[in-house]
From Swiss-Prot:
Membrane topology qualifier: Lipid-anchor
Family annotation (InterPro entries): UPF0257
Record localization: Cell membrane
Name under which the protein is recorded: UPF0257 lipoprotein YnfC
Lipidation (N-palmitoyl cysteine): 17
Length: 236
């Protein structure tokens, strides 16, 4: 076998020589916002994105859209949760996020553009030395967040006066398929649910099309819910 052909095959086996995009870590802002506003984190120079969750009947259950600066700050963020009839639209203004409609100050920021406080709910966020939000403290609860070495969210633990709810995620061993994960939810020591996500990815190792299965184990027999997630991502 000729050496050039051997090198070409080796590149294909190592999965990367034909892909000019380097694998970037998740930024503190992206990882932390995805935790708080419940969307899948993205990496790379994201300019704007939308994530649409659809039921197995093809109905839109939830949609998240956002725009980011070249520095990785969220300029705008919108959430429409049709299943729970809630919505949120934020726009960046100096050290705050304002309500996009009323212009009321909603979220106070720290550092470059990281979450600091939600005054109306009495919630404050704390960050680690790398700028990732590691805890949220309110009047009657505390949430602790975990990440891996690349900044990927590994779950959270919510503690209140009644119980402890923990979510533990285990991502794929393939670093380019972080969103292929399984997660387990527990109330105290009792498992109440599990989630499986599998995706197709773009050149930045971001998910494009995903299949989500949520199993509710709090009822007998357990009930499975199937969804698809469609992502649209534009880059700088």
């Amino acid at each position: 076998m000729k050496k050039p052909l051997l090198l070409t095959l080796l590149c294909m086996i190592l999965a990367g020589c034909d892909n000019p995009k380097s694998l970037e870590s998740f930024t503190p802002e992206m990882a932390s916002f995805s935790n708080e506003f419940d969307f899948d984190p993205l990496r790379g120079p994201v300019k704007d994105f939308s994530q649409t969750l659809m039921s197995e009947n093809g109905e839109v259950a939830k949609q998240v859209t956002g725009t980011l600066s070249q520095e990785g700050c969220f300029d705008t963020l919108e959430l429409h949760d049709l299943e729970n009839n809630t919505e949120l639209a934020l726009v960046l203004d100096a050290n705050y996020y304002r309500d996009a409609q009323t212009l009321e100050k909603k979220v106070q920021l720290q550092g470059k553009c990281q979450l600091a406080a939600l005054p109306s709910a009495g919630v404050t966020w704390e960050t680690d030395d790398n700028g990732f939000v590691v805890s949220a403290t309110g009047k009657e609860m505390k949430v602790e967040y975990r990440y891996d070495s690349e900044g990927y969210p590994l779950g959270k633990t919510t503690i209140n006066s009644q119980n402890t709810l923990s979510v533990t995620a285990k991502p794929s061993a393939d670093p380019r398929k972080k969103l292929d994960y399984t997660a387990v939810s527990r109330v105290d020591d009792r498992q109440v649910g599990n989630v499986t996500l599998s995706c197709e990815y773009d050149a930045y190792a971001n998910p494009v099309d995903c299949r989500l299965v949520i199993v509710d184990e709090s009822v007998k027999p357990a009930v499975s819910h199937h969804y698809t997630i469609k992502n649209r991502i534009d880059y700088y």
